[in-house]
Amino acid sequence: HGVSEYGMRYAPFAEFMTEHGFAVVANDHLGHGLSAEKDADTLYFGPRDGWMHVVDDMYALRCRTKEKYPDVPYFLMGHSMGSFLTRTYLIRYPGTVDAAIIMGTGHQSPAVVAGGRAIAGAAGKRHGFDAHSPRVENLAFGAYNKAFAPNRTEVDWLSVSENNVDAYIADPLCGQKASIGLFYEMLGGIRFVSAQKNINSMNLNTPILFIAGDKDPVGEMGK
């Protein structure tokens, strides 16, 4: 799942898949949904190597699922931030899934990633990595809604369905402020998955399906 949401937000999709013969499992990433610290002010992966801990959690879920369904193929699907986590997973745990679906992913130049991470790092040292920074959040997400002006809400970019947008806004487990540390870790993850030496560590025999929305700003409108 993406930033500021959680696994059960996709329950209708899971129900559709189970009706068609699939078993569906999902976790709430660190700091999100039921994995968040009670009364936490921000979404926070933790003080050190949080991105990789999230990926390790994904592998732990895979292992538990395979124990219950040992003879069933395991497909890993990641959306938005989850797409970058899935790409990281495929590098760190090659050959442990039968196929992957990468949805709503993107690419940023090394210079942009380095610049953003430097800004987030400086802000974290000044305010604390578990704090929220409007400036850092604006650098990450500020441009997304501009393509949908005039805006009805601050998150019109999330979905072409107004009902989906309104449900997101009304959900108490969605829309929380992301910490500086989360953005710092996520940019580190994006840098990791973009490095050719890391890409070379993937199992090239694993089938991968890429899905991109033609109005999704994360993937530059489907580009």
Predicted regions, residues:
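Alpha/beta-hydrolase active-site loop
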Residues: 45-67
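Alpha/beta-hydrolase-fold enzymes
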Residues: 86-173
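Short beta-strand/loop motif that positions the catalytic acidic residue
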Residues: 210-212
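Conserved alpha/beta-hydrolase
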Residues: 9-40
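Active-site glycine-rich loops that stabilize anionic/oxyanionic intermediates
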Residues: 1-5, 80-81, 214-215
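Alpha/beta-hydrolase fold nucleophile elbow
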Residues: 69-80
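Acidic catalytic loop of the alpha/beta-hydrolase fold
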Residues: 175, 214-222
